[in-house]
Amino acid sequence: MFVSSRKTGLIVCFSLIGYTASAFSASLNPAERNETQQRQSEVIEQSRQQREALQQLNNIVQAPLKADNALQGPCFTLREIRFNHSTLLGQRDQTALTAGYLNRCNNLEQINQLMHDVSNWYIQRGYITSRAFLSEQDLSGGVLQLEILEGRLEKITINNQTERMTRTAFPAREGEILNLRDIEQGMEQMNRMPSQQVTIEILPGSQPGYSVVNLTREAHLPFTGGVTFDNSGQKSTGEQQLNGSLALDNLFGVADQWFISAGHSSRFATSHDAESLQAGFSMPYGYWNLGYSYSQSRYRNTFISRDFPWHSTGDSDTHRLSLSRVVFRNGTMKTAIVGMLSQRTGNNYLNGTLLPSSSRKLSSVSLGVNHSQKLWGGLATFNPTYNRGVRWLGAETDTDKSADEPRAEFNKWTLSASYYYPLTDSITYLGSLYGQYSARALYGSEQMTLGGESSVRGFREQYTSGNRGAYWRNELNWQAWQLPVLGNVTFMAAVDGGHLYNHKQDDSTAASLWGGAVGVTVASRWLSQQVTVGWPISYPAWLQPDTVVVGYRVGLSF
């Protein structure tokens, strides 16, 4: 059938108007919507990993010194206290430790207390194989000689064998003073790989003052993977999704981890379809971590306007390079600095014709802090981040843009935080907060959304997006019982809420959403099954959400 160019233009115009109107609450294209959901899911997963790592920290408790009347004896006035063979005790620390003992008469019990205080100074800072002791000496001259043994690392072994990966996973080096925090960091780097789970023992070395750190590792295959089936997709591109993932551990023997995952609409339809691919690696070096990831997303949707079929398609490719450094850790907290460079290219087409207004390349850099801490009997995370759009790598710029156009060279601040608290042995509370702020309008791929399994539960197809806002997630989990073969049965109840604030160029983005959900998960080592039922509680009238949202997920792991 022949259609004139003028008529074609009118059809396109009316079709786009109709398509936009039908998606009033969903201003993002399917690729952007998928990316924002993935980003929100990554925030949840990152907080979970931070809390798990926090549980592995060892808080060293100072042991009280038991009084021994047999040590009292005569007292000696001490004019000077020397710390022999100490490289870590600075002058200020020495002054603080000896302040209560100088120029006063001390008996052997008090001198023993001083040795205990000095040893605990080392232990509290993670130097668990260092200690102070006395050698035979004459105290009548008023000078006390404290001998300091700063225990050193002889070697790190795995199952009593030396392996190359310990050199990249552990910041500790042979011959250096042994610090528990360096060992914990290395264990954390190892345990991030499922096939390299280890336990630790510290053994005497072959020479005095030296120790061997031996890691015990059970035999596992060097890869893990899984397949999942769920209904997390969008109606326009297919609700039922089939996903597969594979992770390879220690491929090059340097504690490196490689992963790849792919997803596809389970119906593999020609008119409505979505597919995704993610791949990347992470590589540690002591307190540093280098990571790279690539993600690809494709969608296809067919809609009818004026009895004419229109094919809406799109694709996006995202590269992310990250570098992080743990700058502080002790027995109760850990803090890391994280930097990232990202590039995203997105293209959208209508009947095979590129739509320049919604196709672009954006680059950005970010700098953030990842902090986790044991707090009030629970586990807390706090991660602020600054994001800046840049012109690098051929990205779009803001040259000659009007004031109300979205910014490619944007400034954006985000904050994610969480708090996990065990109410009983089987009931836990988890609260999560996420916020975003930008003074100027953002493109859809940089906006935040409200509504969905990873933001405000109780909504799925209907959501709202904007440049600034926040949401708060609350859930109670009850691990009820364990079934043979099927595994643990856990019940969940959640109430979430969020708000997007007005932007002066886009008043329609203002909205408050509240939703609730209940669910049950049955999970074992190999099989997991989950069903959730959600419902909207409060929302703007124009959103018109579904009355009830049912989600399900079945997964197999190996």
Swiss-Prot record:
It is found in: Cell outer membrane. Pfam families: POTRA_2, POTRA_3, ShlB. Residues 1-25 form the signal peptide. Residues 34-62 form a coiled coil. Gene3D superfamilies: membrane protein fhac, membrane protein fhac: a member of the omp85/tpsb transporter family. InterPro entries: Hemolysn_activator_HlyB_C (IPR005565), Polypept-transport_assoc_ShlB (IPR013686), POTRA (IPR034746), ShlB_POTRA (IPR035251), TPS (IPR027282), TPS_OM_transporter (IPR051544). GO terms for cellular component: cell outer membrane; pore complex; type V protein secretion system complex. Keywords: Cell outer membrane, Coiled coil, Ion transport, Membrane, Porin, Protein transport, Signal, Transmembrane, Transmembrane beta strand, Transport. One of its GO terms (molecular function) is protein transmembrane transporter activity. Residues 76-151 form the POTRA domain. PROSITE patterns: POTRA (PS51779). Its main location: membrane. One of its GO terms (biological process) is monoatomic ion transport. Belongs to the TPS (TC 1.B.20) family. There are 2 cdiBAI loci in this strain, this is locus 2. Probable outer membrane protein component of a toxin-immunity protein module, which functions as a cellular contact-dependent growth inhibition (CDI) system. CDI modules allow bacteria to communicate with and inhibit the growth of closely related neighboring bacteria in a contact-dependent fashion. This protein may be required for secretion and assembly of the CdiA toxin. Probable member of a two partner secretion pathway (TPS) in which it mediates the secretion of CdiA. This is Outer membrane transporter CdiB. The lineage of its organism: Bacteria, Pseudomonadati, Pseudomonadota, Gammaproteobacteria, Enterobacterales.
